[in-house]
Amino acid sequence: VLRANLSAGDLTAAMAFDVLSMGVGEDGTSGFPLVAVYLSGKELKAAMEVDASVTPIMPAAQLYMSGAEYRFNTNRMFFNRVYAAYLEDVSFDGDCSLQNTYEIDDHALYRVVTGMYSAQMLDTVKDRSFGLLSIVPKDEHGEPVTDFSQRILRDRNGNEIKEWYALAAYLRSF
């Protein structure tokens, strides 16, 4: 959940913290940790549908996706707006130039990294979409995740990697 804007100009770690400052990790420090889960291709498309349908009426619920591209038509019915969905194949040779896109396989599992709060909210999509969409976070074997604390990403010292810190590290790269 993004809580503040980043304006053009000099940025600080404190500004990055303000953007993603919600929550407390299991380690007792500020900020939700990042977690890694797996979604099927069909579920990735469902997340895109949620974004395309809900964001226009509730901007605070916007999902900011990286490595994905989709096209949608706002004149179509809710939760049926996305008509094209792709994943991006990016080269990390320094310039992060886009190589190509490829279609999403509905049955394949894709690794997704997100904040703990967002990950825990994914399984509410079925109820909130009146059963039209379903997103169930899974482990690498395709089994539903019941304990998100087991999916927390940690640095080499075992510390939780926080959402706000990931943003600060990204901003430092500029």
PLM regions and their residue ranges:
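Catalytic centers of hydrolytic enzymes
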Residues: V1-F174
